[in-house]
Swiss-Prot record:
Keyword check for rRNA processing: yes
Any one GO molecular function term: rRNA (uridine-N3-)-methyltransferase activity
EC number: 2.1.1.193
Described function: Specifically methylates the N3 position of the uracil ring of uridine 1498 (m3U1498) in 16S rRNA. Acts on the fully assembled 30S ribosomal subunit.
The reaction(s) this protein catalyses: uridine(1498) in 16S rRNA + S-adenosyl-L-methionine = N(3)-methyluridine(1498) in 16S rRNA + S-adenosyl-L-homocysteine + H(+)
Superkingdom classification of source: Bacteria
Gene3D superfamilies linked: 3.40.1280.10, Hypothetical PUA domain-like, domain 1
Entry's Gene Ontology cellular component terms: cytoplasm
Compartments it resides in: Cytoplasm
Keywords carried by this UniProt record: Cytoplasm, Methyltransferase, rRNA processing, S-adenosyl-L-methionine, Transferase
UniProt protein name: Ribosomal RNA small subunit methyltransferase E
Gene (UniProt): rsmE
PANTHER family (UniProt xref): 16S RRNA (URACIL(1498)-N(3))-METHYLTRANSFERASE, RIBOSOMAL RNA SMALL SUBUNIT METHYLTRANSFERASE E
Family the entry assigns: Belongs to the RNA methyltransferase RsmE family.
Length: 229
């Protein structure tokens, strides 16, 4: 079933606009064909009621049961020098159920804060596309970039992926926790000084073995472990 995204409801109708109208027509939805629409944390089965050039009115047939992520994960991701890699990370984090995404600026990361802020709108669009693909009912919140030195451990379990220095294995993390803060480095990882600063603040170093992973692979690995165990 094709899934679309709506920000507007009129009674029993959900309204598709702009880019969603274009996507709808590309899918060539047939008359009386049912499709899904995500709206305000819920997914509905709908049919077309009315259609014109600017909008499509979708009549709600039924509300589907939806699942929320079992863990509340905040991902602190060092902004990769290749910003296209960040697009991939945002998409994967959304599909995996991360609730909050915070870009961080570290020694080896991309440094231009204004450029990062400009990318935020694109990342929000990627979140919507990933929601439709994965049938996730709620968006991942994307926050403004912060400096690594400003991070504070605020979750039940606070983790830094640290494949270059000391670290525990994922099995030694508290997998019963409900809230996690996960800090992931850029290409080349964190410096020894940065790792030490975060450990002194209370972040637990975690080592993913046996090999050194790309930053986008590390995100998928650690989030999958936390969500499913």
């Amino acid at each position: 079933m094709h899934v679309f995204y709506s920000e507007e409801r009129r009674g029993n109708l959900l309204i598709l606009r702009e880019g969603e109208v274009k996507h709808f027509r590309v899918r060539r939805i047939e008359k009386d064909e049912e499709f899904g629409v995500i709206h305000e944390g819920k997914i509905y089965v709908c049919k077309v009621r009315r259609e014109d050039k600017r909008e499509i009115s979708c009549e709600i047939v039924e509300e589907l049961e939806t699942k929320l992520p079992p863990k509340d994960i905040t991902l602190y991701q060092s902004v990769t020098v290749d910003l296209k890699t960040m697009d991939t990370i945002v998409r994967q984090a959304t599909e995996l159920g991360v609730l909050t995404f915070v870009p961080i600026i570290s020694e080896r990361s991309f440094q231009k804060e204004e450029a990062i802020l400009k990318k935020t709108e694109k990342w929000k669009r990627i979140v919507i596309e990933a929601m439709k693909q994965s049938r996730r009912p709620i968006p991942m919140e994307i926050k403004k970039p912060v400096r690594l030195s400003d991070l504070i451990p605020e979750s039940e379990e606070n983790i830094i992926l640290d494949n270059f220095y000391e670290g525990v294995k994922p099995k030694d993390v508290n997998l019963e926790a409900k809230t996690y803060s996960v800090v992931v480095g850029p290409e080349g990882g964190f410096s020894k000084r940065e790792s030490q600063i975060l450990r002194e603040k209370g972040f637990k170093s975690v080592l993913l073995e046996p090999y050194t992973l790309r930053t986008e692979t590390a995100v998928v690995s650690i989030v999958s472990i936390l969500m499913n165990f």
